[in-house]
Amino acid sequence: MPALLRMTTTAQLAGHTQGGEPLRRDMTRIALAKPYWDAECEKAAVSALSSGRWVKGPQARAFGEEFANWCGAISAVPCQSGSAALWAAMRLLDIGPGDEVIVPGMTFIATATAVSLVGATPVFADIEDEYWCICPDDVESKITSKTKAVIGVHIFGQPFSPRLRTICDSHGISLIEDAAQAHGALLEGKMAGAIGDIACFSFFPSKNMAVGGEGGMVTTTRPELAERLKRLVDHGRDDTLESVELGTNLRMSEVNASVGRVQLKHINSWVSKRRENSDELNHSTKIRENSQHAWHQLCILSDEPTSVISYFDSKGIDARVHYPIPCNRHQVYSEHFQHEISLPNCDLIAHKLVAIPVHPSLSDEELQRIKDALHHSTF
């Protein structure tokens, strides 16, 4: 496994702290993430509120259409959160009791709980040692007659392996993208959102784009799923308002959709700026061939993450571990396993990945401060 920006020991960090310059009082703290908000966002939100049509209006419809056109999907439907999007994906594929869905062991817990909430079983697969996405070899070894789908996570904005598409096609199972962190990522010329059968996005404030609150988006590349997707987020109702299948209220508000439409206009330039910032920080994170990283997070491997985070904190820079506990080791799942699940890369890597700021709002001075902190805390 490559030592990506391998960090120093506690003693070395202590030496740098003692010998380095203290944080100046005029220096503002550098946030790990910073949601975008400007006069255009505010104007859109106020306009949506003033319209008196706060739900099921033109803003949400337009946002879905524009998002689908942007990412290359057949259809896109806004919803209340990334977690809601994952639940909708399960229902859209009729996944339920007796079914299995293969998910990565290292991801946000919602990837796995979406499977459990429909009564299906999440089967945890290990991650790659270089790119940290779900490992195709481990996925293929865990496919059974019960496997209904694979959820590939574009972790931190890194596109998952194109082999997942081949594996799913050869076994006749669906591929779901968890693209919560991958707005603007590209894999072999396709944008996240148009790689799998279904994709799920999050607009949580820390993501590459947001909606002024909670929000999500479900996209599909399969025309036969498009109309059903619209029904599932609105109580399973068709155009006659009859509920023809089991659904629930996952609709996005007009206010959130109006903000999302504004932010969608800027997302390409924001992702480009994230890539520029990532390059400027001169890290050695490996990027998959024939892909473009979206840099939701710039994560570095550290043998002593607590010490590194403390050092960055002393310099007024936010940093934290993503994600310290593999999903299978969370209490909600570990209590239900009758045997130890072997996910060696998850166990080795998950608690060592330190995320540092890379967002597009960073000034030149802030980028330099982050570079200096990296220089003083890496080999």
Please provide the spans of the model-predicted regions:
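N-terminal "arm"/small-domain region of PLP-dependent enzymes with the aminotransferase-like
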Residues: 7-53, 58, 315, 357
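PLP-dependent aminotransferase class I/II
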Residues: 12, 20-21, 61-65, 73-76, ...
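Phosphate-binding glycine-rich loop
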Residues: 53-100, 114-117, 124-126, 190
